[in-house]
Amino acid sequence: MTTTVLPELGFYTLPGQPDSSRDLIDEVRLGEQLGFGRVFVSERYNKKEAATLCGAVGAVTDHIAISTAATNHNTRHPIVTAGFARTMQSLTGGRFTLGLGRGIAPMQDAFGIGRITTAQMEDFADLMRRLFRGEVIIGHDGPAGSWPVLHLDATLDEYLPMGMVAFGPNTLELAGRCFDEVVLHTFFTDETTVRCVETVKAAAERAGRDPDSVKVWSCYATIGDHIAEEERLMKLVGRLGTYLQGYGHLLARTNGWDETVVDRFLADEVVSSVRGLDVVGTTEQLEHVATLIPDEWLAPAAVGSPAQCVAAVRNQLDLGCDGVIMHGATPAELAPIIAEYRATA
């Protein structure tokens, strides 16, 4: 029996830090069997290099759509990125979307990678579009960089779907102008989510585009009670704690949260001694961290029974999102929630 595809639902493969990159194979096969419409591939500089993971996803699936969410345009030469995207389109029969993001500024500073600007991403997106139309680009000198020649194939005339992981208003407006899908950040409040959707759609309309053609994905932590308590602690408290460590003030400003809470959080001895709470934090450490995070900050998530999770996911669609990424859990962990979603359609 063929499973009906749920195009409005997606998941991240290899959430958090996997024991092995090969875990992806069973995850995406099951995700496709369950009927997820799209799998999202994140990137970390260890066992989660995006091009490798995307190739593996494409090789072991038949119809699920695949998006990077996200890679950074300045960690590869533009021709390497364009070649990666074209190879993925060929491998998958056109199921691939190249998703970009700004990255994490402290990490970029530490590694000597330049910080990414809105102008750079807009310039880079235009370069990718031109390369996929078969253009020979001579002497480009723009915000994304300078190159003598950029060229893929003179016979190429394709449209490359592109996505954006967006946070602030400038990036959201850019996504509406130039991109095909937008992934919002985890732990956005309902008010923030509505504002982001409206910003994207309005920017698309001002650019003369059909607002419905730009798909906005809520990235929504979906952690059911059927998952062990220690794992739930890692996937919720550990994940939000890691975000607060990386860019807590930005997240607080975006949601209208009290930034002094972030200051106290970052000054805590346990928090300052553990980098990557969602990877290496112990249960004892995470229980302590939970006392530092207001309950309302953890509230924008799907938790509880499968029915409660489904209700929370559907609320994201009611807020105006075109799709929901059930974030932080594997397809196996999400299976009871998908079953409830189908049963109550």
Description of each model-found segment:
Residues 47-56, 188-204, 332-336:
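Active-site-adjacent beta->alpha loops and helix N-cap segments on the catalytic face
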Residues 7-13, 39-41, 65-69, 96-100, ...:
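Hydrophobic faces of well-ordered beta-strands that scaffold small-molecule active sites
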Residues 19-30, 84, 166-174, 305-315:
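Short, acidic/polar
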Residues 50-71, 75, 124, 131, ...:
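Alpha-helix-loop-beta-strand connector modules within alpha/beta enzyme cores
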Residues 8-22, 71-78, 156-167, 222-225, ...:
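Active-site mouth loops of central-metabolism enzymes
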Residues 1-68, 160:
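N-terminal beta1-alpha1-beta2 module of alpha/beta enzyme domains
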Residues 2, 115-152, 193-194, 198, ...:
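An alpha-helical appendage that flanks or caps ligand/catalytic pockets
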Residues 35, 57, 88, 128, ...:
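Conserved, mostly hydrophobic/aromatic
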